[in-house]
């Protein structure tokens, strides 16, 4: 969504395309620097982006059924406007390093393999986890969970992981999660 709003097509590349998160983020930071975009410009653009149609309703329905944590490789500085529109779900994500002038100079990961590490930490204190995602960086947590699903993933990932149920619609994902509970 940010690539479209900013008019920078190179930023369409995500972890759905590049499994190496550090490589992807360093490349993205270079693109932002090249275009003179700092945190302020990015936050202004993100504030204009609405959740995907059906996302808020899905989360609301899911939160009525079970506890929900969003584990994301986004950054706290980017997530807030969207989380507000989604009714402030719990989100665990990373942090950007930002210079006084607003230039993004780097990023700090919460921990290595944050999605898988978080799922394992939750399991270590007695929680059962159910996970869904669309990208390479979601596969570890999906496979480590009691149940795991692909949601609106790429054809290549679905082909490479045929053992994972894949869904395109929120209602179908909700029913699969409900069944796994």
Q: Which residues fall in each region the model found?
A:
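Alpha-helical substrate-recognition element adjacent to the catalytic core
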Residues: 1-95
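Alpha-helical segments flanking ligand/cofactor-binding loops in enzyme cores
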Residues: 60, 120, 139-140
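Glycine-rich phosphate-binding loop signature in dinucleotide/nucleotide-binding domains
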Residues: 64-66, 122-128, 180
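Acidic, Mg2+-coordinating phosphoryl-transfer loop and its flanking beta/alpha structural elements
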Residues: 68-73, 127-168
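Short, well-ordered alpha-helical microsegments
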Residues: 76-80, 138-139, 174
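Short acidic-hydrophobic, aromatic-tinged amphipathic segments that line or gate anion-handling sites
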Residues: 92, 164-173
């Amino acid at each position: 969504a940010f690539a479209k709003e900013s008019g920078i097509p190179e930023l369409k590349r995500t972890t759905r395309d590049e499994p190496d998160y550090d490589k992807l983020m360093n490349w993205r930071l270079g693109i932002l620097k090249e275009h003179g975009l700092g945190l302020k410009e990015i936050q202004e653009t993100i504030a204009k982006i609405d959740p995907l149609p059906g996302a808020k309703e899905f989360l609301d329905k899911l939160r009525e059924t079970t506890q929900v944590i969003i584990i994301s490789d986004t950054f706290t500085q980017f997530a807030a406007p969207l989380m507000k529109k989604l009714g402030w779900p719990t989100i665990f994500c990373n942090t950007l390093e930002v210079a006084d002038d607003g230039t993004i100079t780097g990023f700090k990961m919460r921990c290595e393999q944050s999605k898988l590490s978080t799922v394992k930490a939750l399991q270590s204190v007695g929680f059962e986890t159910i996970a869904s995602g669309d990208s390479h960086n979601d596969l570890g947590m999906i496979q480590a969970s009691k149940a795991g699903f692909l949601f609106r993933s790429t054809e290549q990932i679905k082909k490479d992981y045929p053992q994972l149920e894949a869904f395109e619609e929120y209602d179908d994902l909700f029913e699969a999660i409900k069944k796994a509970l």
